[in-house]
A protein has these predicted regions:
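N-terminal acidic leader/helix
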Residues: 1-34
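Hydrophobic beta-strand residues in large extracellular and virion-surface proteins
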Residues: 6, 20, 38-42, 55
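Helix N-cap motif at beta-to-alpha junctions
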Residues: 9-13, 44-49
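Short amphipathic alpha-helices in soluble, non-transmembrane regions
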Residues: 19-22, 51-61
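Conserved short beta-strand edge segments in small beta-sheet-based binding/regulatory domains
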Residues: 27-32, 57-67
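BRCT (BRCA1 C-terminal) domain core and associated BRCT-interaction motifs
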Residues: 31-48
Length: 67
């Protein structure tokens, strides 16, 4: 099993959580960053990589909007 730590902007946490539930990925909230992002640890198998890429893309889209 692989693990990925993702910093999720608060503005997209609901959408992020929906994707986690949709793909039934094991996850844990680890804390928050100084910037107010929520640190989420996601555990996944190799076959679930595409779901993790989707999560990362969502976060990147919201992060790009902030810049």
């Amino acid at each position: 099993m692989k693990t990925k730590e993702i910093n999720v902007p608060v503005i997209c946490i609901a959408e992020f959580a929906d994707l986690l539930a949709e793909y039934d990925l094991t996850n844990e909230i680890m804390g928050s960053t100084e910037a107010g992002e929520i640190i989420v640890e996601v555990q996944y198998e190799k076959e679930e990589r595409q779901a993790v890429f989707e999560l990362l893309e969502l976060v990147e889209d919201y992060s790009a909007d902030d810049n």
